[in-house]
Amino acid sequence: MQVHVVDHPLAAARLTTLRDERTDNAGFRAALRELTLLLIYEATRDAPCEPVPIRTPLAETVGSRLTKPPLLVPVLRAGLGMVDEAHAALPEAHVGFVGVARDEQTHQPVPYLDSLPDDLTDVPVMVLDPMVATGGSMTHTLGLLISRGAADITVLCVVAAPEGIAALQKAAPNVRLFTAAIDEGLNEVAYIVPGLGDAGDRQFGPR
């Protein structure tokens, strides 16, 4: 599996805001949107493009556009905070949704929503989730995508734990992962340390 850490001063600054416990809900959402855009830039750096003949006010020239805009798949609910900025950068993209909650006793994923196209053959997919902790929610999501024929899958997250990366490597070794940081690991209740806290609660308030 390809793992890319986005090492950029602007990404580090937004990540600092997200980590800071003093950041309120609105500030957290704003920093997440801005960091999502930086992740999108890096993840699409080598995206296939096609030439587009156009005319400027002065002359004819040739521009470019993405050959195949991706399907964006936010993992609810925390991934909701990433989808608007990703969609703004990729306006031709379609959007699917996967909903996965976490059982606080077992730390296992509890799926509750699957809104994806039936056939994803030859469709590039970008999965959006601020955190890859145990990897349970993400491996569930990847399984849904792969079962529908998806083969070109990129995961975008803010922070990832080594345990989660190992789980993804085992479940879907051909996936690409772009993250702003790989943290130390998981604590006794399977939260990433130092992490961000609960990314859903920090965006929208506690459930």
Swiss-Prot record:
Summarize where uracil binds, as residue positions: 192, 197-199
Identify a single GO molecular function assigned to this protein: GTP binding
Spell out the activity regulation: Allosterically activated by GTP.
Q: What does the record's cofactor remark say about binding?
A: Binds 1 Mg(2+) ion per subunit. The magnesium is bound as Mg-PRPP.
The entry's 5-phospho-alpha-D-ribose 1-diphosphate-binding residues are: 77, 102, 129-137, 198
Q: What class of enzyme is it?
A: transferase
Alphabetically sorted, this entry's keywords are:
Allosteric enzyme, Glycosyltransferase, GTP-binding, Magnesium, Nucleotide-binding, Transferase
Reactions accelerated catalytically: UMP + diphosphate = 5-phospho-alpha-D-ribose 1-diphosphate + uracil
Which Pfam families does the annotation name?
UPRTase
Its GO CC terms are:
cytoplasm; plasma membrane
Pathway field of the UniProt record reads: Pyrimidine metabolism; UMP biosynthesis via salvage pathway; UMP from uracil: step 1/1
**Family under the similarity heading:** Belongs to the UPRTase family.
What HAMAP family does its record include?
Answer: Upp_B (MF_01218_B)
Its biological purpose is as follows: Catalyzes the conversion of uracil and 5-phospho-alpha-D-ribose 1-diphosphate (PRPP) to UMP and diphosphate.
Protein name in the entry: Uracil phosphoribosyltransferase
